[in-house]
Amino acid sequence: VPDPAIYICNPDDELMRPPDHESWFILVNAPRQTDPNGPDNQPGTLDWHTPGLAQDYADRVLDRMAARGLDVRDRLLWRVVRTPADLEAETGAPGGAIYGTSSNGQRAAFLRPANRSGIPGLYLVGGSSHPGGGLPLVGMSAEIVSDLVGDA
């Protein structure tokens, strides 16, 4: 993504930073992780395991921030770069998609996971489950699960 939107969170939590320092969380949109078992050269995907790719992308994000007047590069004590490949490995989200499965296409709404899972007592709620993302739909998802739990 050549010019990504950059979300910055600056929590004031002494447990997250050394004294007299700041802690920052920076989030940018990034292409999904390529399925190593899928077809090559899928549009909009990258192999985030490629050596140097993640660090180079993180450097570009810091460069974009500097170009926009927020240069923090010389103030970094350390950084942790997490990629879509990391998110996929840690959460099982396909391609490391932070917003769940794709919402594009006529059938997408019907392909989201149901609110009641196959495991007794485990319910799914939020933007990645039925009926989908966005605050109103997440609220509806919570109401559905509340009704299901009430019936359990």
Name each region found by the language model.
Residues 1-84:
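C-terminal segments that line or cap access tunnels to active or ligand-binding sites in enzymes
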Residues 3, 56-60, 93, 137-144:
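Generic recognition of stable, solvent-exposed alpha-helical segments in well-folded globular domains
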Residues 11-15, 29-33, 103-106, 128-130, ...:
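Short, glycine-/Ser/Thr-/acidic-enriched flexible segments
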Residues 24-25, 41-45, 89, 93-95, ...:
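General N-terminal targeting signals
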Residues 82, 150-152:
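Active-site-proximal substrate-binding core of FAD-dependent oxidoreductases
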